[in-house]
Amino acid sequence: MYNPYQQQGMGYQQQQQQQQQQPNGFYPQQQQGQSSNQPQGQPQPQQQMAFNQPQATGIGGMPQSFGNSFSTMPQQPQTGYNNNGNNGSVYGNGNFGQQPQQQQQQVKPQHTGYVPNSSMPMMNTTGTMPPPNPAQQPQLQSIQPQGTGYYQSANTANVHSVQPLQSQGTGYYVSTPNLISSNQTQQPLQAQGTGYYQSQPQQVPPPQQAQSLQPLKPQQTGFYLQPQNQAPLEPLKPTATGFVNSFANNGLNNDIKIPAIRLSFITAQDQAKFETLFRSIVTNGSNTVSGANCRKILMRSGLPPSQLARIWTLCDTSKAGELLFPEFALAMHLINDVLQGDTIPYELDSKTKNEVSSFIDAINLSIANQDSSANDAPKTPFDEFITAGVQNLQPQPTGYMPQTSFGIPLQSQITGGGVASALNPQSTGFMAPTTFNMSMNTGTPGLNPQITGGAPASMQPNITGNALQPQTTGMMPQTTGMMPQTSFGVNLGPQLTGGALQSQYTGGYGSVMPQQSGPASMPNLSFNQQGLQSQLTGLQPQPTGFLPPSNFSATMPLTAQKTGFGNNEIYTKSNFGNNLIDNSSQDKISTEEKSLFYKFLKLLILKTKVVRFPHCCGNFRKSGLNRADLEQIWNLCDINNTGQLNKQEFALGMHLVYGKLNGKPIPNVLPSSLIPSSTKLLDNLKNQLKTEPTTTKEKPSFGKIDALSYKNNDDDVLPNYRNRRKVYSAKNEEQSSFSSPSAKSVNHSSSTLQTDDISVDKTVEKKTAKPKYSGFSREINLKNIASLENEIKNISNPENCYDNSIPSDLTSRFDAIIAKLPNLFNEISTIDNEITNAKIQLYRKKNPSSIIGSGPNGEITENDRKKAKSRALLRARMSALTGKSTESEDSLSMEDEQQSAEIKRIQQENGKNQEIIKDIRSSISDISASLKSTMTGSNMISNQEFERWEFGIGLEDGVREFLDDLKSNSNKSVTESSPFVPSSTPTPVDDRSSSPSYSQFKTAEERAAYLKEQAKKRMKEKLAKFDKNRRNVTQSSRSISSENSREQPQQIAGSSNLVEPRATPFQEEKYVEVAQPTQPVQSTQPVQPTQPVQPTQPVQPTQPVQNVYNAKQESDDEDEDDEEKRLQEELKRLKLKKKADKEKRLAALRKQIEDAQNESDEEETNGKDNFGGHVNVPQAAPVAPSAAFSQNSTNAPRSVHAAVTPAAGKNSTGLPSTTMGHNPYFKDASASSTSTFDARAAEMQRRIQRGLDEDEDDGWSDEDESNNRVAVDNKVEEAKIGHPDHARAPPVTAAPLPSVTPVPPAVPVPQANTSNEKSSPIPIAPIPPSVTQEPPVPLAPPLPAVDGFQEPPIPSAPAIATAVQKSGSSTPALAGGVLPPPPPLPTQQASTSEPIIAHVDNYNGAEKGTGAYGSDSDDDVLSIPESVGTDEEEEGAQPVSTAGIPSIPPAGIPPPPPLP
């Protein structure tokens, strides 16, 4: 058999002369050689050849049998497991000059590699097989084979005289020198380390220095580094996951000194992560990360290379191509910002720059300090493996630990290290019984194994190789077998065994071919020049390592899982590269270009937002491109074909121009990357709009409504105009039926309104949702507005549908108050403005300014000031010329400033008042809105909406007027819908004595029914009072009601009921009065006019009112609670009482006026007879009308009643009527002989003037609602009544009478003052104060009766005269301020018939608006004491001629005080 080792022998023998023999193994071999005193010389090769028996190398060497003599036949090579390389050395001695063929014959195959035992650490053993000398075979037979390894047999024998060889470590750690005997001159073999890292070749020192050699340290080979003190391997631990940990698992470089400085632009957590990542990629001995390593991390972010290049440019502040930690942290921070949507800054801010630079300076300073303090060279990543000798080599486990054929996984074993005594003995010579013994050629089986490595006590240490020369083993690198693939997928490099030996491959998967050693010349073989042929050995390679006994074979160590950003499958290298290539290939407009183009665009356009065609053309032509290119660029830019470009389109055009200039072709169609974002948004919006109608149409109309729960809604009509009109017509029919007199009731109609609210609201909403067409003409718009108003009016008003549980009178009161509020607030505001203007005018009057204001309301404008200054300057110049002193400009300006400041202060007060009024209005509207929502049961209305639609605030005039009309119409429709026609009520008669009044109802049931219906009627008429001319209407209605009440004085006095005035009876009565003036004057009916005088006693009306109250209470017990009943009935009682008094006074006054008109046309012959019947009527006429109309319409009736009562002391026949032109101011002399004073009338008049018994209607009561319907018509009728009397006015002032009995009350000063507060003074105040000084007929007889009454006496007498004077009549003065006596006095007063004409004139004036009771008069006017007079009254009294008026005879009452 060819032995490949034959070529090794010569190479080794040439170099073994100068080197000491070195055992290769973990522990020294126990070799049996010659005695130590054997001289060195020729026999040495023989002895060494004796050792060149087949030796088991590795752990658990195979048992070998050697014969006593070496045969020339080579034995089968026996190698350990995984013989990847020849870890042994063939010893040869070049000094003996042995034949090469001898060595070739006797050198046996050497076992290389190791077969680790499961209980021992790994070791690499090499056997030594010097070629034997045939001449020394007898001696060689006695030498026992030596096993190197762990489990060698302990049975060793000394052959012949050869002493037992000393155990020599065939590994790293040589046994201690004391094992060698003292007489040994041979130096021990130097241990050789096997593994990756070879030490420098060293010559073996001289023998005297052999004791100082340090043993080789075990070295670890492979991936999993084991500590020196090997502990049993543990299972693999899970590795940390994450982007940072994926790098950190490979190890952190903790040698980097990073100062503890905090970077403000990143968080502490981010800085810690970046530091960990930085340490994981920085190589040992460096403080910076290279560009290649940094690129691996930065590319994982997914950003395009262009952006990463910009980030690198910003971060590499030192321009060194490498990054320190602050620069690396800054790069990671910028990448995070870009991933979150931010842009890369063009340059770093100063703060960040300063932080990074200071951090770099701190790092440089720390490095300098470290270099100065370090004594040795800077550390490198390979310092721990590079040593001067072999002493620093670390133990190496070579390869993976295979699963042996014994079925027990082998533990990794450290070769070398520790004390020899601690190692387990190894059997040599025999091999443990294995299953593959048959595959080995064991040689002679008779040899006993020897214990090596343990140095047992039974054996003496044997010195081996005493005569041997120092030999070098394996100077030339040898590879036994093929170069196998290791378990890591990488070919392991050669390993030096020993000081100068190249490392040899051990372990691995590659099957080692059997090797044959034979004579061959290997002169200076270099690495990879293999001279040995690989030979297959008996053992098959198996994986080693800590793995369970399974078929699993790990090819590479586990790597950390990729987590974090950039580690998904979409960021794989293939996708990454493709995306980067695509993105880089796309043509885009960079942000730098956009900013540059936008700045340039600002120069082209200043105000407009678009670039016109001339600007662009001129700008693009400057590029020098031809016309075709420019046209193509323009067509690409002007996407919408508008002839102008916006910012983005302009930037696109500039980009294309520059691209063409740089050699890029102009695209025929814009790529998606160049389309402006605005255009993309518009296109997207267009697509959405195109697709939306289809989606809405696809939606089913009925949805998913269940058939069981579906209910058709009849009100849900289709939205076309025809159906809307049908809906409105249906609503109109409902309303017409509701407003007709045949409607069932108000409650039923209100419930109908409530049910129709929803449908009405729907139709109104549909109407408002109708689109407005601005293209219509004004006429069409007006027609549409008119039609819309009509439709709104035709819709039933749902706002009046109150809750049925709320009493109707409360709702009516609420509506009435709400109706009064707007006018009330307007009046308050107007009055406040007038007060403000009056204050300003007053201030200007008190402090006249030299500047005449020409502005509105006399305000001073700037032009006025300039004129005043110019005039002042002119005056100053003139004064300088003339020497006169004038006012300076300073005084003028100060005066102007004072005036303007005062006016401003007054206006500020007005503004504050307006704010207060506004606050009050808002609070009232808030309360009203909540009340209305409670009463109607609807949702809460906001305060602003309530003010807007109820008070009309914020609406235009036309809308406000329409709302007013709408409210008034709705109120009228409500009142007309349910008129009450009592079955037991007699129909009203047209004559004066048959107007519908409470006295017509004889029974209590009829009266109660009448009152109940009247109350309901008033509740329904609440809202009707609110209109534009409300006060005028109410005043005229009061006057008409007074005429109405005058027709039936007797019935009113007897029953004291409420009279419901009707328009038609009033008109008929007035026409009767005018047409037939002589009928009531006939002598056959003198007593009829006196009858209404008797019931004028003021005490009687309370009794019928109480009866009415009781009847009303009985009728309402079923409907209302006790508390509400009590309150309502109390209010109704008071109202009825007031109205009864009113009706009495008005009826008497009207009767007197009519009688006065009739008496003016009588003949003188009917004087006394007619006066007997009409005595009281003319007396009341002058008193009541002027007082009533000047003070209050409700004041007149009492004065009428008082005047109707005749004074005591008059004769029964009365005074004869005057024959002098029927002048009411003068009477006969015979009439002056009797007293015409009526104490009761005087007291009544006095109370009227004081406002004690008047029914003050301040706009918040409900008394005059019944008078509103006929207000306007009655106003005209009253005017008609007054006109004929006014025509007869001239005779009144023309013919004075010699004596007038009723003149004493001619002092009208107090009443004139009260009447003129809101109206112009009455110019016909007839009698001056001097008239009272003339003594009329003595009034002594009636005085005792007058004094007996309890009413206020004389001090209030002038007020009575005031009333008389205002009336313009010469009626006798009612000087007595007391109530009339209970028995009626005689009614014949001849002189009282005459003053009526004057009163009629005054009455006409009042009706015309010139009297005291004008349209602007207020019910709340305070009565001024009668003793106080005014200049206006005196002025009003002057026009009356007093010549010929006889003085009134002195009465028992002192004359009124003179005027002031």
Curated annotation (Swiss-Prot):
Biased composition (Pro residues): 1299-1308, 1323-1344, 1447-1460
Subcellular location: Cell membrane; Endosome membrane; Cytoplasm, Cytoskeleton, Actin patch
Main location: membrane
Modified positions (Phosphoserine) in chain numbering: 739, 749, 995, 1160, 1230, 1233, 1261
Region: 5 X 6 AA tandem repeats of Q-[PS]-T-Q-P-V, residue numbers: 1076-1105
EH domain span: 270-359, 593-681
EF-hand domain sequence ranges: 269-304, 306-338, 625-660
Membrane disposition: Peripheral membrane protein
Lineage of producing organism: Eukaryota, Fungi, Dikarya, Ascomycota, Saccharomycotina
Region (15 X 12 AA tandem repeats of [SPNAG]-[IL]-[QKNGT]-[PSA]-[QT]-[GQAPISTLYK]-T-G-[YFGML]-[YVMGAQL]-[QVLNPAG]-[ASQPN]): 142-568
Biased composition (Low complexity): 1-56, 80-110, 117-128, 136-146, 973-988, 1076-1106, 1175-1188, 1228-1239, 1289-1298
GO molecular function per UniProt: actin binding; calcium ion binding
PTM section of the record: Phosphorylated by PRK1 on threonine residues in the L-x-x-Q-x-T-G motif of repeats 1-6 to 1-15. Phosphorylated by ARK1.
Binding, Ca(2+): 638, 640, 642, 644, 649
Residue segments, region Disordered: 1-151, 185-214, 729-758, 880-901, 969-1127, 1149-1460
The protein, known as: Actin cytoskeleton-regulatory complex protein PAN1
Function statement: Component of the PAN1 actin cytoskeleton-regulatory complex required for the internalization of endosomes during actin-coupled endocytosis. The complex links the site of endocytosis to the cell membrane-associated actin cytoskeleton. Mediates uptake of external molecules and vacuolar degradation of plasma membrane proteins. Plays a role in the proper organization of the cell membrane-associated actin cytoskeleton and promotes its destabilization.
Chain intervals for the UniProt region annotation (8 X 6 AA repeats of [ATVSP]-P-[LVI]-P-[SPQILA]-[VAS]): 1295-1357
Coiled-coil regions listed in the entry: 1111-1170
